[in-house]
Amino acid sequence: NTDSTSVSLGFDAARRSEIFRLSVAGSYFTEEQKDLSTKESHMTADNWYLKGQADWFFTAKNFFYLNAKYERDRIALLDYRFMPGVGYGYQWIERDNFNFSTEAGLTYTKEEYMDEDGEKNDFMTARFAYHLDYTVLSKVKLYHNLEYIPNLEDSGVFLVNADAGVQAPLTARLSLDSKIVYAYNSSPADDRYRTDTRYLVGLSWLF
């Protein structure tokens, strides 16, 4: 038998004017499992990220974006991955209770792994993404995001990031966030899995 202890924290901030939209988000997740028979503990998850995006609407629905993401995952032996990018987006629907947008652009990726070789990579990628959220019962938000990032120099190398969840308010700023997070890396560090799927329940702070 094992005893697991996990912590999941996140924040999400967004501001919208007539022609600009700014969003910033971050997340931290750690999990430790303890073998009750041997009393030995080992870390099964330890990762975090910060990301931000600025959108400039040159029409009511069309926008250009600048974004950046920095992430680290000790279990995946990822020391860091930094991804600044630019692109074009289209806001198909924007309402108080329903939003849907798509994006396409270019991203520069620089990463370093903590394996024996200390592998370092930098390359250009494309980026395709969509964002969907729908609010029910006036306050409970359902959301789904998907991001596909193929290496332009090697078609066999790509990343997929996706999540789907439910966010329910506890206070005016604090929400309970229950979600599935999926990440796929076609070229991970040695002896590491390509797929990482997590089922998280945690707290999110809304600005």
Can you annotate each of these PLM segments?
Residues 85, 169, 195-207:
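Outer-membrane beta-barrel "beta-signal"
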Residues 18-24, 61-64, 96-100, 134-142, ...:
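Repeated loop/turn-to-beta-strand initiation elements of outer-membrane beta-barrel proteins
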Residues 17-19, 28-32, 70-74, 90-92, ...:
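Transmembrane beta-strands of outer-membrane beta-barrel pores
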Residues 14-18, 55-57, 71, 89-93, ...:
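Structural signature of outer-membrane beta-barrel channels/translocons
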Residues 1-2, 36-43, 73-79, 91-95, ...:
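Outer-membrane beta-barrel domain signature
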Residues 3-7, 44-48, 80-84, 98, ...:
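Residues that define the transmembrane beta-barrel architecture of outer-membrane proteins
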Residues 1-51, 67-73:
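Transmembrane beta-barrel domains of bacterial outer-membrane proteins
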Residues 24-26, 52, 66-68, 84-86, ...:
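Membrane-embedded beta-strand positions of outer-membrane beta-barrel proteins
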